[in-house]
């Protein structure tokens, strides 16, 4: 795992999100999760809401330009497909080196900045989280005492510009201070580095966090990810990590291509799934959990995945188990996709074909989403009870409990409590139109339990009258397509006593089925 990572130096990522007051693309107004404010909630809640992620690798991190490493220009349609598959976080790799001026100001090229921002808004348009970092900056970001003064000065200038540009974005934008900072070319580059390297990385993390916080606004309380040396989960690197200012809104960033000989080494094993394999992976996650999560420090696995060795069955088993095991320990995994999927070659982490908007490894993707506890809207739901040829279908006699028995309810609502903590909870609501005509503009009403109060809502607006709540679509999600189209919104609540679901749901005055 460690040496192989050296060869993928070009494949790592920087995710950047920037602040705009209004950007329009494809007829949709950006901002569904862009300007939601920054909540004062535990970092673990944010990580839980991120659920599972996908890296737009080898694109904005490509040296020289967006398409220099063979991937097409990023489109809104690409990110739509990622969201439809079940991913809730976009990590967007960006290299700033080559797009900034000389010392002492290191002025970032605004055309580059705005392109990164445009792509990030594709994700916000899909109610996603976005991570922004510094990616391939190894030419100047060197973890040595001799380089420390110069690097700190440049880090401060660069992060100050990025943070100021993104100041108005809410807590669905997460900054990541660096990507895999390490002593490039050293014999211990991928094996923990030296004490000097680890200490200087801690100082760089502190410099970046302080620069971000100093810009004020939402950045004063924004959630920020910081890596260990090389983003390694080795005991040496995680034990020596120092959290800047012991900031409660700092999240640990790790990369875990585990196990290396299966996930990354083209000459390694192509099989995975034994009891030993699973217990070994569990042990790696346990070490991270016991060091950080157990002690109140949230963790995101910013990069992971497996390469294509003509071993789909093993990759499916690995992807599902990896996601399930990570989630059980409160870790959010983000798949590294570099757009390269040719079987039998090195670095073939690609699972999504950006040229034709299809999945190169659909089974792997579905297993990964399944493991995290989600489902892909790109996969039609199959009936659990097949119709037998001896029993003709009749409109008056439903034959299986999986078939809706209320044909008059053309709309169904899924009310899902996605997370709860103490006296608070997060809820996601999805409205599905099973009818044959689109819904153009919707108002969803329900009766709230008397012990619950909504504190904030995104992708919709609400009015409360007693215990009756009326929720109306935002400007960009008012149309729900016919024959299975969906729109979603979410909110947080405070509650006392038992956390129960509301009752009496109607959409535009008509009762609907509730799940």
Swiss-Prot record:
The gene from which this protein is expressed is engD
Residues annotated as catalytic? 180, 303
Q: Where is the composition biased (Low complexity)?
A: 377-407
Q: Which reaction does it catalyse?
A: Endohydrolysis of (1->4)-beta-D-glucosidic linkages in cellulose, lichenin and cereal beta-D-glucans
Identification of the protein by name: Endoglucanase D
Q: Which family does it belong to?
A: Belongs to the glycosyl hydrolase 5 (cellulase A) family.
Keywords from UniProt, A to Z, are: Carbohydrate metabolism, Cellulose degradation, Glycosidase, Hydrolase, Polysaccharide degradation, Signal
- Task of the protein: Has endoglucanase activity on carboxymethyl-cellulose (CMC), cellobiosidase activity on p-nitrophenyl-cellobioside (p-NPC), and partial hydrolytic activity on crystalline cellulose (Avicel).
Organism from which the protein derives: Clostridium cellulovorans (strain ATCC 35296 / DSM 3052 / OCM 3 / 743B)
Where does the CBM2 domain lie? Answer: 404-515
**GO molecular-function annotation terms?**
beta-glucosidase activity; cellulase activity; polysaccharide binding
- Write down the Gene3D superfamilies for this protein, in alphabetical order: 2.60.40.290, Glycosidases
Q: Give the signal peptide as a residue range, or say none if absent.
A: 1-31
Annotated stretches, region: Catalytic = 32-376
Q: Where is this region: Disordered?
A: 372-407
Which EC numbers does the record give? 3.2.1.4
Give Gene Ontology CC terms.
Answer: cell surface; extracellular region
Provide the GO biological process annotations: cellulose catabolic process
Instruction: State the disulfide connectivity.
Output: none
Q: Which residues form a coiled coil?
A: none
